[in-house]
From Swiss-Prot:
<dbReference type="GO" id="GO:0016887">
    <property type="term" value="F:ATP hydrolysis activity"/>
</dbReference>
<dbReference type="GO" id="GO:0009376">
    <property type="term" value="C:HslUV protease complex"/>
</dbReference>
<feature type="binding site">
    <location>
        <position position="256"/>
    </location>
    <ligand>
        <name>ATP</name>
    </ligand>
</feature>
<feature type="binding site">
    <location>
        <position position="18"/>
    </location>
    <ligand>
        <name>ATP</name>
    </ligand>
</feature>
<dbReference type="Pfam" id="PF07724">
    <property type="entry name" value="AAA_2"/>
</dbReference>
<dbReference type="GO" id="GO:0036402">
    <property type="term" value="F:proteasome-activating activity"/>
</dbReference>
<feature type="binding site">
    <location>
        <position position="393"/>
    </location>
    <ligand>
        <name>ATP</name>
    </ligand>
</feature>
<dbReference type="InterPro" id="IPR004491">
    <property type="entry name" value="HslU"/>
</dbReference>
<dbReference type="InterPro" id="IPR003593">
    <property type="entry name" value="AAA+_ATPase"/>
</dbReference>
<keyword id="KW-0067">ATP-binding</keyword>
<comment type="similarity">
    <text>Belongs to the ClpX chaperone family. HslU subfamily.</text>
</comment>
<feature type="binding site">
    <location>
        <begin position="60"/>
        <end position="65"/>
    </location>
    <ligand>
        <name>ATP</name>
    </ligand>
</feature>
<feature type="binding site">
    <location>
        <position position="321"/>
    </location>
    <ligand>
        <name>ATP</name>
    </ligand>
</feature>
<comment type="function">
    <text>ATPase subunit of a proteasome-like degradation complex; this subunit has chaperone activity. The binding of ATP and its subsequent hydrolysis by HslU are essential for unfolding of protein substrates subsequently hydrolyzed by HslV. HslU recognizes the N-terminal part of its protein substrates and unfolds these before they are guided to HslV for hydrolysis.</text>
</comment>
<comment type="subunit">
    <text>A double ring-shaped homohexamer of HslV is capped on each side by a ring-shaped HslU homohexamer. The assembly of the HslU/HslV complex is dependent on binding of ATP.</text>
</comment>
<dbReference type="InterPro" id="IPR019489">
    <property type="entry name" value="Clp_ATPase_C"/>
</dbReference>
<keyword id="KW-0963">Cytoplasm</keyword>
Amino acid sequence: MSEMTPREIVSELDSYIIGQHKAKRAVSIALRNRWRRMQLDEALRHEVTPKNILMIGPTGVGKTEIARRLAKLANAPFIKVEATKFTEVGYVGKEVDSIIRDLTDSAIKMVRHQSIEKNRFRAEEMAEDRILDVLIPPAKNNWGQAEGTQEPSATRQAFRKKLREGQLDDKEIEIDLAASPVGVEIMAPPGMEEMTNQLQSMFQNLAGQKQKAHKVKIKDAFKLLIEEEAAKLVNPEELKQQAIEAVEQHGIVFIDEIDKICKRGESSGPDVSREGVQRDLLPLVEGCTVSTKHGMVKTDHILFIASGAFQVASPSDLIPELQGRLPIRVELQALTTEDFERILTEPSASLTEQYKALMATEGVDISFTADGIRRIAEAAWQVNESTENIGARRLHTVMERLIEDVSYDASEMNGQSVIIDADYVRSHLDELVADEDLSRFIL
């Protein structure tokens, strides 16, 4: 679990997301409260429930990006799902309980990776010993059993030194590795993925663990053996318990496009993918127990963050019970020309930096002037205003159109420089921006 302070979390998010300070503050406080809760006495800790968040804002302003970056910062089980993928229980489609199952699967992977990293040093020593056993085989007695290494310890240590210095990296050896389980492809109707996974696991377990000889270079063998030895040091039952505890105490679920499951007007017939899904989400958000293949998981202390554009519907169109379980509301603002300028230059790996790096691979030096960046931002904002406002995603379309000629000819422009200033931008974009029909279909 992350121990970062709210200020540190916001600072980290600032490196990738421009503006939206209120949303950053809300998620940073929610993330810090996870840590604060774990410092309390057990009796009080059980009573402190997470304050779920609803992020409201037009498309392309950073809602999903906040979720992506938060996943890396959280150091906790995290899953992002689309609300539109689910249907009401009893109909064809994914049930909302699969959110918790997928979250538990991701926690298993996370905890396994942490356990392997924790045991890596020991695994490296064991991998070295296995390679040395191949290079210096132990002598065998009359019954074909190993009597132990007969060579003097100095010889083994000399080979170990060479191995660690990389002198033997390119030497080929034959080692026995666990064979990959035979894949059994099972087709199942939508919503029955859990049954498919269980059947596949059953067939793989029936096949058993077999060893297979591989002829590889020592440097590749070392990596493979480390992974195999580290996996042996992991206790599967302990792994499951740690993963389930991590989900229950620190798990975060991000539900995107929640506005798409709002009921719109009066309709006859069942609302299997709208209001029905909201009703199914209620127990998860409030707290219930979900059965997974790894064990029972309680959702009482899982943090839920929902987001939606709410351009057609409004938050009040959610059923009242679900509204009450999303107490923190954060409104994200539409992006301005100034925001677009900052997006083009300030974030780590900004769009301009990406295009510079891509063209540099062909030996072409691209530079963007301040007035050129300003004009790109104005063009993107203008197209958003005159057609459909898709926020910062418009910059990708505009930049691709702007760099198209250079990108096409780059392989024949080795050693040349291209300066993208306001005049360059006008000559490539102004005609498209001015013509609403063209900008609607091209930009």
